[in-house]
Amino acid sequence: MSAPIMKKVKGAGVKINLAMWEGSLGPILCVHGITANCRCWDVLADVLAPEYQILAMDLRGRGRSEKPAKGYSLETHLRDMNALMDDLGIDRAVVMGHSLGAFIGLAFAAQYPQRVDRLILVDGGGDLSKEQMDNVFQGIKPALDRLTMVFPSVSDYLTAMKQATYIQPWSTEIEGYYRYEIESTEGGVCTNIHPSRIAEEANNIRKVKSAAFYSQIRCPVLVLRAPQGLFSDDDILLPEDVIDRMVREIPDARRFDVDGMNHYGIVFQPHEARNQAIREFLKGL
C-alpha cells in the first residue's frame, strides 16, 4: 500500500499530526484507541483509499502530535477535532473511531451534529458497567504495560510486541504501527506515549456514560463489533446487552459482527466481510 502523507494541523491549542491518504470522496476522519496511533488505520486505509480521502489523526499525547502534560478527556479531543476540521476547511466528514476513538466519535457526533455525515463505531462507544469496564482494562493491560518499558533496541521492542497472542497474525502493517511509536531513551528505546497522559485519559473515560449521547445522534451509524475476547469472553468491549442497547437507542444505527476478530484484529487484520459492510454503509445501502 502507499504510505500516507503526514501533515501538522491546528488542534485546540496543540499541533495535531494527521496521516493522509488522498481520495476523490470523503473525507473520513479516523480516531484511534487509548494507546494507539494514526497507523492503526493502515489496513482500512488501503481498503478505502483512493476512493475515499482518509484523515487519520494522532490524538494529543500520541504519535507525532504535541503532548501537553495535562488535558486528556473527551472534551479536549472534541475541541481538537473541531479545530482541525476548521483548519483544513472541512465542513462535514464521516467519522470512524476505534475503541476510545469510538467514544470520542460518538461524543463528537452528539456535540457537533452539523459536522458528521456518517459515524462508524469500531468496537467501542458502548455504555459499560463498572465491572465490564474493569474487564476491558484488564484485557488491554499488556498494551498499557508497554508504556513503562525500556528495551535495548528496536529489534528487542518488536520482538516483545510479537509475543502478544491477541495481535496475531503479525504483519507489515502491525510492525509499521509499532515502529511509528518508538523513540530513543536512556538505556534504549521506548514508546513515545507518556503513561501519565494515559492514566488521566483512563480515569476520565471511566466516568463517561456514553448512553447519554445515543438519542442526540442525528446521522446514520454503523457499529462494528468484535465478537472474540482478547483473553476471555469477559473482556469483549461490546457485550450483547451493550450493543443491543446501542442499536435500540441510537436513532439510525445498525450493527455488524466481524466474525473471528478480537478488539485489535477488527482493525489490524484483513476481513472482506467487514470491508464490504463499511463500503455499503458509506454508499447508503
Q: Where do the protein language model's features map onto the residues?
A:
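Conserved HGGG/HGGXW glycine-rich cap/lid loop of the alpha/beta-hydrolase fold
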Residues: 17-64
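Active-site loop/oxyanion-hole signature of alpha/beta-hydrolase fold enzymes
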Residues: 43, 55-96, 267
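Conserved serine/cysteine hydrolase catalytic core
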Residues: 184-249
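Catalytic histidine-centered segment of alpha/beta-hydrolase-like enzymes
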Residues: 258-270
